[in-house]
Amino acid sequence: LSVARGNYFLTLLSAFLITIILLIGFVVSDTHILYGVFIVLIGIVLLRLFKINLLSFKKLTMSQVIYIIGGALLIYGLDYLYLHFHDVPTNEQELDRELQHMPLYMSIVTIAIIPAIVEEIVFRGMIIRVVFRKHLFIGLVVSSLVFASLHESDTWIGYLPYLYSGVIFGLIYLKTKRLEVVILIHFINNLSSLLILLWG
């Protein structure tokens, strides 16, 4: 399941550089959408230049499409159960306030598309497949915990939706070996949350 065949430490250094660029693009996209998209694209191009093969851009198979649909439905179902017993996470309350002053197209790009691409490349791609490429289960655990911890919550239980989402993304990624699959699941999850916040 290796995505880079070169020296481990050189690959790690390249991955760190690309991660910084992607995260800068992520942050910049909140206020300057075109600059943010451009920076993220630079990060994706650098993946190819440094031969870190996280994205294949091949046509999805039917089984991968089923994983996308199933993964999105599973997360939606778990979110529904969570919200039945707990309040809306702080992170989504913050998003709700931001959306009041943002055009729809900008909301979709900055809340649904860019986070899905950047977070999956960084958390599932870089952490699982680069940092822990010989210890994938440890990578799955670490990536899920870091992914959850970087989202905002006032309570421990508030991190739960991000934790189980991270685990599901990681498991499906390891099963399908296609980062595009979990990017699409993540995008669908973000988009559905966005639409519910806007019109729910």
Q: What residues fall within each predicted segment?
A:
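Aromatic-anchored segments of alpha-helical transmembrane domains
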Residues: 16-25, 72-79, 144-152, 187-197
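Interfacial transmembrane-helix boundary/kink motif in multi-pass membrane proteins
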Residues: 2-16, 50-81, 132, 138
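Membrane-embedded alpha-helical segments of multi-pass membrane proteins
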Residues: 34-44, 105, 109, 160-168, ...
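Function-critical hydrophobic alpha-helical transmembrane segments in multi-pass membrane proteins
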Residues: 96-152
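Hydrophobic alpha-helical transmembrane segments
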Residues: 9-13, 65-69, 105-109, 137-142, ...
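Functionally important transmembrane alpha-helices
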Residues: 23-28, 158-200
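Juxtamembrane helix-loop-helix connectors linking adjacent transmembrane helices
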Residues: 54-115
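Alpha-helical transmembrane segments in multi-pass membrane proteins
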Residues: 5-51
